[in-house]
Amino acid sequence: MSLDKIMNEAISPWMKGDGPDSDIVLSSRIRLARNFKKYQFSTMQNEEETKQIQELFKKEFINKTVEPFGEFELLKMNELTPLQRRVLVEKHLISPNLAGTEYGACLLSESEHISVMLNEEDHIRIQCLFSGLQLSEALQSANQIDNWIEKEVEYAFDESLGYITSCPTNVGTGLRASVMIHLPGLVLTKRISRIIQVIQKLGLVVRGIYGEGSEALGNIFQVSNQMTLGKSEEDIIADLKSVIQQIIQQEKMARELIVQNSSIELEDKVYRSYGILANSRLIQSAEAANCLSDLRLGIDLGYIKGISRNILTELMVLTQPGILQQYAGGPLGPEERDYRRATLIRERLRIEKN
């Protein structure tokens, strides 16, 4: 695996899969926060300690193979351009917070299912991504990597509290489980606000596509647990999965309601968006996201034939500003990005139809 490959292949292997409930659930993510006993927390570290953690991972973990994820490569933030960092964020491989650090790094698996972020809010954050609703499978893989790392380092752990983390909400298991979910039916029926209120009352968090502070572009929402103290990993996963399954049922009911009461209006909306995507010469990211959401809904409901349902996930990544500029070989102005975005979408749809 090389940096060029990571940058030039915008679609990670995990994005190409069709996991359970993938008509509504786009992806499942598990993140484990860990700190090392011998170092101060990242928020209090000096430059030398952050470099020592990087060197530890360079020595013990790079070019090592862990099946089924392949070899691991270490990407140091201060050796990447701002554009390369942005691409990693847009591919969901690192957090925006890590991208802004000088001495952060990412240990990335060849399959891109696994990324271990170094010197972010915690010393390490192990992230595992799967398509569809596969929280248990993602947790199993994250624990596999966690055990692999723990053979070489000693974690900060308290017998009564659990894993010690920088943020109090992560103390305990250090587990943050999240699901990326496409909810156009609930948005169109104006039920989404009520659903979000119910989710929040259950102690869960609802965010946009790139996490905290981001928008819910293309009717895509991220639902995750908030507290970890006093609950086992299995209980956290079971509780989140139960809520997600209820949201899936609510979304399916909303879609059925729209088809029953407004079928021709919905079909018109889908085909108008399809027409915009297939013919536009300039398109901004927000409009593209909304039209792609409509197209995906049309595919799921059978209005549109011959186009893969994965096109939403794929083009939501491919048309992000960083990846467009990476493909172009350098910075682009807003209008140039809109032109390239429209061109890429037209070409992708043409390939699908042929």
From Swiss-Prot:
Regulation: Appears to be allosterically activated by the binding of pArg-containing polypeptides to the pArg-binding pocket localized in the C-terminal domain of McsB.
Signal peptide: none
Function: Catalyzes the specific phosphorylation of arginine residues in a large number of proteins. Is part of the bacterial stress response system. Protein arginine phosphorylation has a physiologically important role and is involved in the regulation of many critical cellular processes, such as protein homeostasis, motility, competence, and stringent and stress responses, by regulating gene expression and protein activity.
Matching PANTHER family: ARGININE KINASE 1-RELATED, ARGININE OR CREATINE KINASE
Positions annotated to bind ATP: 27-31, 92, 125, 176-180, 207-212
Catalytic activity: L-arginyl-[protein] + ATP = N(omega)-phospho-L-arginyl-[protein] + ADP + H(+)
Domain spans labelled Phosphagen kinase C-terminal: 24-254
HAMAP family, per the entry: Prot_Arg_kinase
Presence of the UniProt keyword ATP-binding in the record: yes
GO cellular component term of the entry, any: extracellular space
Protein keywords: Allosteric enzyme, ATP-binding, Kinase, Nucleotide-binding, Transferase
Protein name: Protein-arginine kinase
Intervals of motif RDXXRA motif of the pArg binding pocket involved in allosteric regulation: 337-342
Gene Ontology terms, MF aspect: ATP binding; creatine kinase activity; protein kinase activity
Classification via Gene3D superfamilies: Glutamine synthetase/guanido kinase, catalytic domain
Species the sequence originates in: Bacillus cereus (strain ZK / E33L)
Phylogenetic placement of the source organism: Bacteria, Bacillati, Bacillota, Bacilli, Bacillales
InterPro entries registered for this protein in UniProt: Arg_Kinase (IPR023660), ATP-guanido_PTrfase (IPR000749), ATP-guanido_PTrfase_AS (IPR022415), ATP-guanido_PTrfase_cat (IPR022414), Gln_synth/guanido_kin_cat_dom (IPR014746)
One GO biological process term: phosphocreatine biosynthetic process
Family: Belongs to the ATP:guanido phosphotransferase family.
EC number: 2.7.14.1
